Amino acid sequence: IGALQGAVDRVLTQPTQSIVRNVAVVNSLYK
């Protein structure tokens, strides 16, 4: 269960980081 939770966290964290990065780029473009 712990390993599965770690895998789920990893899968969810990577797209979240890319989304945050994209949002930061868009915000910098529109400022």
From Swiss-Prot:
Keyword Glycoprotein: no
CC terms in the record's Gene Ontology section: cytosol; Golgi membrane
Top-rank lineage group of the source organism: Eukaryota
Keywords assigned by UniProt, alphabetized: Cytoplasm, Golgi apparatus, Membrane, Protein transport, Transport
GO biological process terms, semicolon-separated: protein transport
Subcellular location: Cytoplasm, Cytosol; Golgi apparatus membrane
Membrane topology per record: Peripheral membrane protein
Main location as per UniProt: cytoplasm
Subunit record text: Component of the conserved oligomeric Golgi complex which is composed of eight different subunits and is required for normal Golgi morphology and localization.
Family stated for the protein in its record: Belongs to the COG5 family.
Record function comment: Required for normal Golgi function.
Protein name: Conserved oligomeric Golgi complex subunit 5
Annotated organism of origin: Bos taurus
Gene from which this protein is expressed: COG5
